[in-house]
Amino acid sequence: MASLSHILVLCVGLLAMVNAEAPQEHDPFTYDYQSLRIGGLIIAGILFILGILIVLSRRCRCKFNQQQRTGEPDEEEGTFRSSIRRLSTRRR
């Protein structure tokens, strides 16, 4: 009877060791939110700094007319006819 109990204890011990050493399956629904949050903050910071550099560099070329005003108003700036002239010259 003693040998039967020894065999039973040995089998239970082996089963416990096999279950403890078995590789755990990858659960596809377990997410690492900490690394996702850090990655998002890094990308947001890079885009923010890139936007500030673009604004400060003044190298962004726009299609519309970028003539700087000299501070003196045009002689016909406020009239309806001059606004029509300005619009018609832009289309050419």
UniProtKB/Swiss-Prot annotation:
Chief location of this protein within or outside the cell: membrane
Top-level lineage group: Eukaryota
Annotated tissue distribution: In the brain, detected in cerebellum and choroid plexus (at protein level).
GO cellular component: apical plasma membrane; caveola; intercalated disc; sarcolemma; sodium:potassium-exchanging ATPase complex; T-tubule
Sites bearing Phosphoserine, chain numbering: 82-83, 88
Region (Disordered): 65-92
Residue numbers on the Extracellular membrane side: 21-35
Alphabetical UniProt keywords: Cell membrane, Glutathionylation, Ion transport, Lipoprotein, Membrane, Palmitate, Phosphoprotein, Potassium, Potassium transport, Signal, Sodium, Sodium transport, Sodium/potassium transport, Transmembrane, Transmembrane helix, Transport
Molecular function, one GO term: sodium channel regulator activity
UniProt PTM: Major plasma membrane substrate for cAMP-dependent protein kinase (PKA) and protein kinase C (PKC) in several different tissues. Phosphorylated in response to insulin and adrenergic stimulation. Phosphorylation at Ser-88 stimulates sodium/potassium-transporting ATPase activity while the unphosphorylated form inhibits sodium/potassium-transporting ATPase activity. Phosphorylation increases tetramerization, decreases binding to ATP1A1 and reduces inhibition of ATP1A1 activity. Phosphorylation at Ser-83 leads to greatly reduced interaction with ATP1A1, ATP1A2 and ATP1A3.
Keyword Transferase set for record: no
Transmembrane helix recorded as keyword: yes
Subcellular location: Cell membrane, Sarcolemma; Apical cell membrane; Membrane, Caveola; Cell membrane, Sarcolemma, T-tubule
Record-listed Phosphothreonine modification sites: 79, 89
PROSITE patterns hit by this protein: FXYD (PS01310)
Bias type Basic residues, positions: 83-92
Family that this chain belongs to: Belongs to the FXYD family.
Function according to Swiss-Prot or TrEMBL: Associates with and regulates the activity of the sodium/potassium-transporting ATPase (NKA) which transports Na(+) out of the cell and K(+) into the cell. Inhibits NKA activity in its unphosphorylated state and stimulates activity when phosphorylated. Reduces glutathionylation of the NKA beta-1 subunit ATP1B1, thus reversing glutathionylation-mediated inhibition of ATP1B1. Contributes to female sexual development by maintaining the excitability of neurons which secrete gonadotropin-releasing hormone.
Domain remarks in the Swiss-Prot or TrEMBL record: The cytoplasmic domain is sufficient to regulate sodium/potassium-transporting ATPase activity.
Protein's UniProt name: Phospholemman
Organism: Bos taurus (Bovine)
